[in-house]
């Protein structure tokens, strides 16, 4: 697995995955490994790849991480509004600039990795904290500059991830405080009594009901992993019923043992990234000694991932989406998924100790 990352995946995404004309990364490669050059590019993908490349031991990969982050900082803010871009045109001009919390979170996550590798991004971090402050709500943050509804669980989960990573990288307690604000939202608002995690809410954080509400088992598994990392990094108990949460994740699996995209019987699709989160959650729970009877071990999850998603003609690539019968639905591999795969593999290789 280490060799797959070092000799296949990182070379694929730092070489073929890089647009030589702009120095940015492609949004996706097709399943033959050819860049999808006509696709718009999400700014978050630039910095997610920066986060990944910063973890490499190769100096060239680390230099590319800083290059991508520098591009996002220098060219990612709209001149008139000052908002952070969401999407870029193929020529890298700004197409949309909603100043979305999800995007700000990943800018900050990339900064945490750059701090950890020794880069001087102090002034960038100060600026990004100011950009985040523009979204501050009485509890949590608004979803974007327009304060669009519904309120969303997902960007707050990534703020939890980012805040924990920034605390680990800097030791600054303000980041731990931010993580604990997100954790409070999770305990009080997002997590239901049966262990499922709700996605959408009204302005006052009242859960939406009926078809307006969605539950994604991949995000539930991601919370298991992130809460475990928070406890390890801060030394503080999260006061979350992890066994209940993880059991609800397992209950959401389909007949193959993999996670569908949504927690309902009508969902006929399953992407690759939720399986990486299932792997991370399983590794964390195994290390904690809290694996329930009948749960898969990490190697079982890895085997399913290999059979369904990772055994491809492109070394270091993956298949993105299948239906529940195993038929391939995707025609490209989004670069955004590399972040999920890299962290899952590194967590597995460490025995659940670190990434």
Model-identified regions with their sequence ranges:
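Glycan-recognition and catalytic cores of secretory/periplasmic carbohydrate-active enzymes
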Residues: 1-355
């Amino acid at each position: 697995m280490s060799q797959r990352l070092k000799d296949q995946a990182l070379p694929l995404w730092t070489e073929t995955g890089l647009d030589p004309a702009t120095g940015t990364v492609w949004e996706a490669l097709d399943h033959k490994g050819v860049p999808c050059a006509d696709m718009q590019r999400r700014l978050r993908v630039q910095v997610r790849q920066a986060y990944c490349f910063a973890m490499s031991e190769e100096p060239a990969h680390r230099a590319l991480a800083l290059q991508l982050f520098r591009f996002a900082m220098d060219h990612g803010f709209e001149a008139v509004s000052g908002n952070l871009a969401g999407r870029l045109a193929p020529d890298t001009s700004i197409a949309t600039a909603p100043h979305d919390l999800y995007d700000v979170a990943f800018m900050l996550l990339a900064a945490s990795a750059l701090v950890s590798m020794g880069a001087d991004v102090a002034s960038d971090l100060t600026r990004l904290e100011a950009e985040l402050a523009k979204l501050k709500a009485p509890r949590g943050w608004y979803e974007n500059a327009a304060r669009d509804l519904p309120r969303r669980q997902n960007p707050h989960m990534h703020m939890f991830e980012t805040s924990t990573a920034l605390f680990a990288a800097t030791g600054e307690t303000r980041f731990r405080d931010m993580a604990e604000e997100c954790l409070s939202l999770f305990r009080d608002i997002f997590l239901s009594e049966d262990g499922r995690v709700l996605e959408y809410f009204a302005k006052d954080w009242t859960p939406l009901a009926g078809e307006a509400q969605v539950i994604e088992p991949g995000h539930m598994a991601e919370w298991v992993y992130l809460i475990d990392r928070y406890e390890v990094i801060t030394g503080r108990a999260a006061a979350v019923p992890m066994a209940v949460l993880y059991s609800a994740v397992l209950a959401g699996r389909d007949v193959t043992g993999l996670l569908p995209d949504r927690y309902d019987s009508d969902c006929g699709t399953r992407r690759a990234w939720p399986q990486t989160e299932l792997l991370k959650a399983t590794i964390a729970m195994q290390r904690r000694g809290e694996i329930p009877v009948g749960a898969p071990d990490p190697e079982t999850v890895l085997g399913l991932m290999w059979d369904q998603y990772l055994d491809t003609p492109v070394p270091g690539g993956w298949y993105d989406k299948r239906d529940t019968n195993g038929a391939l639905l995707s025609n490209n591999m989004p670069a955004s998924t590399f972040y999920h795969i890299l962290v899952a593999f590194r967590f597995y290789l460490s025995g659940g100790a670190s990434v």
